[in-house]
């Protein structure tokens, strides 16, 4: 076995596991289930001034203030009207809980390492560092996200105490 093959197998083993899948603009995405804290229905979101457009605001989840990011807007996808399927996935980003708005939660998939391919190269102008890989299940492809990288830089929306920050 070559060193390159061994590295590829180790990487495949590291990416293997359970993923919560969800729909966003008709495409299927997945996040590592260990990063998911809970799934909640849409609720009132309090807008926070002077935040990027994709930051919808904050919610009060059982007494804890959690920032909410709309993944459609984060990915430069047109905002859609909310439906009864629209929900918030609460994820752990470097020890901070954050909510992400998705169109619909699909299922939990157990994806083997050999069923995950590296993200295709789109050239130097396209950043794909937030994609763990492409999960193959049957004839469909699920884009597996590194949710920490997707939301990197957005942790500043809460302080370590979990209180909303903002310089209004």
Regions found by a protein language model. Name each.
Residues 1-168:
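An acidic, low-aromatic, low-complexity terminal/linker signal
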């Amino acid at each position: 076995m070559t060193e390159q093959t061994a590295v590829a197998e180790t990487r495949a083993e590291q990416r293997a596991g359970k993923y919560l899948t969800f729909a966003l603009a008709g495409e299927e995405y997945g996040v590592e289930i260990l990063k998911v804290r809970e799934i909640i229905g849409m609720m009132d979101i309090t807008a926070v001034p002077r935040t990027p457009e994709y930051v919808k605001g904050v919610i009060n989840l059982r007494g804890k203030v959690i920032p909410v990011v709309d993944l459609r807007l984060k990915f430069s996808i047109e905002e859609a009207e909310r439906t009864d399927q629209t929900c918030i996935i609460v994820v752990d980003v470097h020890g901070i809980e954050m909510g992400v708005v998705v169109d619909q939660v699909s299922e939990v998939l157990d994806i083997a390492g050999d069923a995950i391919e590296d993200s295709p190269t789109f050239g130097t102008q396209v950043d794909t560092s937030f994609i763990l890989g492409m999960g193959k299940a049957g004839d469909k492809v699920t884009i597996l996200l590194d949710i920490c990288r997707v939301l990197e830089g957005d942790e500043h929306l809460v302080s370590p105490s979990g209180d909303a920050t903002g310089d209004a």
